[in-house]
C-alpha cells in the first residue's frame, strides 16, 4: 500500500476509536489504551506489509459480531479485556438513561395532572358557589328542582342544570331537564322584563327558545327554560361540511324571521347565543336581554319608554297564564357528565384561530401533498407570518384615531347623537357603529352574515376590534372606503379617511384563510418568483399578485377549481347579508328564498365547477322526469296524504309563583 492509503486508514481508525469510546461513555480510558496500542504496533514493524496488517487488525477489532462479542486476535489479551469491560458497562449506561427518561416523563405527567386537578378544583369551586348562591337567593328552588351543576355563566346571569324532584323515581332517560337562568341582583329590572316578554310572546316555536316558568323571590329572579345539549361553535366551526353549514344558517334565519315578525331586534346574535346540537340537528336562538322593539315610526323603543300600562299588561298576562310542559328524552346525568368532560378536554388544549387557519383541517392534507409534499418549520413560520400580515391589513386602524369621537353628523343643528350601541363587538353593523338612531332588524341580518363569514373562511372571530372605531376600520378594509362613505352619507354621517381602500373579493378572502397552506405552499411561491427570488406584491391588498384579493384584480391569479367546497351562490348570499347599506340589505325572509338553500347546489371537491354544474343539471332533469311519471300514476288520496300535514297548536302559557310551578310543570 502507498502512503496515501496508509494515512487514509489511520484517519478512519482514529475516528472509529473515538466514536466507539464516546458511545460507551469511556472516552478517557479507551483513548489512553488506544494510544498505547498504537505505540506498540508502530514499534513492531515499519514496512508496508506491517502497516497493512495493523490496519486490518484495527478494522477487525471494531467490527462487532452478530452475538454482540468482538473477534479475538492473538496477542491482544489486554485489548480484549477492555472490549469486554465496555460491553459490560453499555447495558448499565442504557439502563441509567432509561431511568432518567422515565423519571422526567413521570415529573411531566405529575405537573400536567396537577394542572388539570387545579382547574377541576377551580371549576368545582365555581360550581358549588353558583349552587349555593342560587339556593340562598331563591329558597323555593330547593322545593321544586334538583340542581346539578353550572352549565354557563355571563355578565348578568348564571345558568344551571336542574331536574324535577317529583321525577326522581323515573328512569334517568325519562326525567325532564331544565336550564335555570339565575339573574344577578345587579341586572336591571327592565332588562329582565324585556327578556321575559320576548321569550313569553315570541319563544317556544321557530327555533326560538321558550320559557316554562318564572320564579321571583325578593330581588332575585330565575327563568326556567327547556334544556338542550349543544356544541361549542369554536370546536366545530372548521369541521362542519357544506350541508351542515347550510342547515345551520337556515335554522338561524328561520329564528330571525320569526323574531322580526314581532318588530323586535335581537341585537345580540352571535354563536354563543345559539344552541346547536350537531348530532341531532336541533337549533335554538336564546338570550333576549338586549332585544328592542321597533315603534311604528321606525324608531327603537327604549326600555324606559315602556308605559306603566304596557308593563302592567305584560305582568297581568304572566300572572294569568299557566305553565307549559316541554318533554325531552335526554339524560340529565349524561348531559352533566358530557359537559364536565368537555370542560376537561378544553383544559388540556386550545389553539388560536390564526394557527388553525394556517394549518387547516385534516382533509386539506391531500391538497398539501398535491401542492408539494411536506412543509418545513420555516415554511410554516412564513405561512403564519403571511396570514398575520393579512389579518393586520384587515384590522388596520390609525393609532391616532380617537375611539370615542370618530363620527361626525352632517347636520350641524343636531348637537348630540343618541343611538343604541348595544351588541357584541365584532357583530355590530355599520349603522350601529355610525350611531344611526333609526336602526332596524337589518342589525341581526348583518350578525348572521358575520357568522356565515366565519363558517366559510374558517376564521373565528373574524372581526375583533377593541372599540367601535377599529370595528369600522375593519369593515372599510374589507368592503372598501366608497361603500362605507356612501352609506354614511345616506345616514347623515361623514367619515374622514387618510387614504383610499379597495374592495376585497369575499370568495378569495375566505379561500385564503380556509386553505392558507395551499396558497402559501413553497412550490406555488417558487412558481411565481422572479429571477432574483422575490415575488411581485399587490399594493392594495399587500398580497402576492397570484393571490391578489382585490375584487377587480387584473393580475394573473392562481386557479382554485376543485378546491372550494362551497358554490358561488354561497358567496352571493354572503355579500347580500353583509351589505353595508342597511336599506339594501336582504331580510331574513328573503334570505330563506335564496338559491343557496336549494338542494341542487352540491359541490364535490376535486371536480371543476362547470363540470359539477353540468352533472347537477342532468340529475335535476332526471329527477323531474321521474317525479312527473310518479305523479301521473298517483291517486287523489295518495297525493293528499303526500302533501297535507297535520298541524297541532300548543298554546304557550306561563306561571309566576313557585307553588303553581311545582304543581303544573
UniProtKB/Swiss-Prot annotation:
Keywords: ATP-binding, Kinase, Nucleotide-binding, Serine/threonine-protein kinase, Transferase. Its EC number is 2.7.11.1. The lineage of its organism: Eukaryota, Metazoa, Ecdysozoa, Arthropoda, Hexapoda. The keyword Signal does not apply. The keyword Membrane does not apply. Residues 145-597 form the Protein kinase domain. This is non-specific serine/threonine protein kinase. GO terms for cellular component: Dbf4-dependent protein kinase complex; nucleus. It comes from Drosophila melanogaster. InterPro entries: Kinase-like_dom_sf, Prot_kinase_dom, Protein_kinase_ATP_BS, Ser/Thr_kinase_AS. The active site is at 268 (proton acceptor). It comes from the Eukaryota. Probable serine/threonine protein kinase that forms a complex with the N-terminal peptide of the chiffon protein and may be involved in regulating meiotic processes in the male testis.
